[in-house]
């Protein structure tokens, strides 16, 4: 395979990763709803350690455990933010109108 073939493969893998991350986010939203209804905390460090351990144990390389840990810490940070917004909705939804839109209407 040449470099363009490898790049096509990476593009395909990136699309699959994005789909899986969105699927994970949907599951996180459902868990966030359950947490809200049962008054469970958003941040559960034991569960996050368990997730990282599971990923590291299932990995067959070439990523080092440290690298996987960093990747998953970031993923879980983003997912925690999604849960936070699910459990504690924004009290003042942002308007889609911009300052420029307001000036154009004047």
Locate predicted features.
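Domain-level signature for soluble enzymes in the chorismate/prephenate branch of the shikimate pathway
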Residues: 1-106
């Amino acid at each position: 395979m040449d470099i363009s073939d490898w790049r096509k493969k990476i593009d395909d893998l990136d699309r699959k990763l994005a789909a899986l991350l969105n699927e994970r986010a949907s599951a996180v939203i459902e868990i966030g709803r359950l947490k809200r209804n049962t008054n469970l905390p958003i941040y559960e460090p034991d569960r996050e350690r368990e997730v990282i351990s599971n990923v590291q144990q299932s990995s067959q390389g070439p990523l080092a455990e440290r690298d996987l840990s960093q990747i998953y810490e970031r993923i879980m940070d983003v997912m925690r933010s999604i849960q936070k917004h699910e459990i504690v909705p924004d009290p003042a939804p942002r308007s889609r109108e911009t300052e420029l839109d307001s000036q154009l209407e004047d």
